[in-house]
A protein has these predicted regions:
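Active-site acidic/histidine clusters and adjacent loop/turn architecture
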Residues: 30-68, 76-77
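Short, small-residue-biased leader/transition segments that mark boundaries at the very start
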Residues: 1-7
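Acidic, His- and aromatic-enriched active-site or binding-groove loops in soluble protein domains
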Residues: 77-115, 119, 123-125, 145, ...
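Low-complexity, Gly/Ser/Thr/Pro-rich intrinsically disordered linker/tail segments
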Residues: 186-221
């Protein structure tokens, strides 16, 4: 079944708050909890244990995503309004193009509990910069010091960046950023996870999918 991810892993469940491309909490995210299928959780724990030996940690941005949340994102993309804060996430084109270009889908693997969005944290680095909703950050493709802080290694773009620079094999990132991406992809692949080529942060466990769920995410007891 699908269960809360009770693992010693950093979590910043972005759709439960305002620090995401809509600027508000998404429908169905009643708590900032990572919920995954049991097999996914077991394998994430193994990835985390391997990374710990390198003084690294995973950080979860999204796990199970209720079907109602996907519908909310679809409606948002079609409402015809776009703020500067929203545009940070898709600087090269309008949010109306997100579907056509494959950045938002009407059905998400996240709704099966078998997909996760995550990044790496360097445990030896200063990760103290916090997101300030009142600050006017540069877009998600800008240098790390100028874009919204995420308390993680520099992957070359921010999370949920709808841009070719966020494609995992993008040639426009630096060698150091490419190494971080490779470290994450390799660690996840060793436990059977497959990366989505347009998003360095998105991984799924092949064969663990199935039916989409729509129960809301609530605080773990």
């Amino acid at each position: 079944g699908v269960q809360t991810c009770a693992l010693p892993i950093f979590q910043d469940i972005r759709y439960a708050g305002a620090n995401n491309f809509t600027g508000r909490p998404i429908a169905g995210y009643d708590a900032a909890e990572c919920v995954v299928k049991r097999e996914v959780g077991v394998r994430l724990k193994a990835v985390q244990q391997e990374l710990a030996r390198q003084r690294l940690s995973l950080k979860m941005f999204d796990c199970y995503r209720p079907a109602r949340a996907v519908a909310d994102m679809v409606a948002w993309s079609r409402n015809g309004k776009e703020t500067a804060a929203e545009r940070r996430y898709n600087p090269a084109f309008s949010k109306a193009d997100l579907f056509r270009l494959g950045y938002i889908a009407t059905h998400s693997g996240h709704s099966t509990g078998a997909a996760v969005d995550l990044t790496l944290v360097d445990l030896g680095a200063d990760n103290s910069r916090k997101f300030d909703p009142a600050k006017d950050y540069a877009d998600c493709t800008a240098p790390a010091a100028a874009r919204a802080p995420e308390g993680s290694v520099d992957m070359g773009t921010g999370y949920d960046c709808s841009d070719v620079k966020a494609h995992t094999a993008a040639s426009s990132v630096t060698p150091a950023q490419r190494r971080w991406r490779s470290t994450l992809v390799a660690a996840m692949a060793r436990q059977g996870f497959a990366n989505y080529s347009k998003e360095w942060w998105h991984f799924s466990l092949p064969g663990a999918g199935g039916a989409a769920y729509d129960f809301p995410i609530v605080r773990a007891r």
